[in-house]
Structures are given as structure tokens and as C-alpha cells.
Amino acid sequence: MKKPIEFYLSGDRVYSTREKAINQLYNNRGYGELKGDKLFLSLIEAAYLTEKGWIKVVDKDKELKFDDLMKLGKSRDEDFDIKYIVYKDLRDRGYIVKSALKFGSHYRVYRKDAEHSDWLIWVLRENQRLSPNDITARARVAHGVRKNMVLAIVDEDGDVVYYKVEWIKF
């Protein structure tokens, strides 16, 4: 994209009414959520697209840079940084990444042009504790909605390792 598309901060999201945003980002690349004539992006999507130079975010006539969006995200979610690392890794690999809060996970991940997601991603820090009940509950939900449960573990260097968790019925 040549000139960044302008988006406006609105609470914990950003939006644009520009047709270019809707066509290039939503229709062609699977970013955001379309509501009426507005394309809404999460802060993580906005940070990613700002870092790539595809959009610019404005709040009260002030442009928010990538670091500003990361700081804003971190102020609202202490795990924003690691969620961003995983989001960026998956997007850079060519996947479509959407929220999976209604499934009790962080992300739903789609192959490009797929109608349904294949994976539910739960993001964790390397030293974060996770109980067997947490793992079982997430694997059970994923199995129930015909998705693969994946734990995305982020180490202190920002590297991500993915572990598939399966529900096996004997």
C-alpha cells in the first residue's frame, strides 16, 4: 500500500469509513470487522498494520505511532505484548487471525480463503502456570467446535513455540 489509510481511535478499537480500507483490508486480507459502513480493527490489528505502514491511527488530531498503540494496548491488557507477538507471527505466516473470546481462547486462526477456522490459540508466557483443568477445558471446547487447540508459548526473547493439544476419546 502506498499511502497509509487513516483510522480513528474509538475506545479499545480503531475504525475507518474509507472504501479503500474496506476493500484492501477487510475484503482482500481479512482484517477487522465490518459494521455498516465502518471497518473496525482491534488494537492488535491496528498495531500490526501501523508497524507495516499500511494504516495510521489518529486520536484527537494526534497520530498514534506503533509504540503508542503498544503502550495503549498494554495499559488495557497486561499480556498485550505477547498476544501481539503471536498475532504478528501468525499473520506473517499468511494466516487470518481473529478473536476467539467466545471460545475461551485468544485467537481463531484461518488458512487464507478458508470459510472456517482450523485452530484456537491460547497465548501464554513461557513461565506462566497453567492447570491441567485449564488445558482440559480448552481442549474440550476446541474439540466441541471442531477446532484444534494450540498453546502458543512465548519465551523471554519473544520467540514462539506452538503446541497442539488434542482431546482423545477412548
Curated annotation (Swiss-Prot):
Work out whether the entry's keyword set contains Lyase.
Answer: yes
The protein here is known as tRNA-splicing endonuclease
* Function per UniProt: Endonuclease that removes tRNA introns. Cleaves pre-tRNA at the 5'- and 3'-splice sites to release the intron. The products are an intron and two tRNA half-molecules bearing 2',3' cyclic phosphate and 5'-OH termini. Recognizes a pseudosymmetric substrate in which 2 bulged loops of 3 bases are separated by a stem of 4 bp.
Which EC number(s) does UniProt give? 4.6.1.16
Q: What is an annotated GO biological process for this record, any one?
A: tRNA-type intron splice site recognition and cleavage
Q: Which PANTHER family match?
A: TRNA-SPLICING ENDONUCLEASE SUBUNIT SEN34, TRNA-SPLICING ENDONUCLEASE SUBUNIT SEN34-RELATED
**Gene3D superfamilies, sorted:** 3.40.1350.10, tRNA intron endonuclease, N-terminal domain
The record's top EC class is: lyase
Family stated for the protein in its record: Belongs to the tRNA-intron endonuclease family. Archaeal short subfamily.
What gene name is given for the protein in this entry? Answer: endA
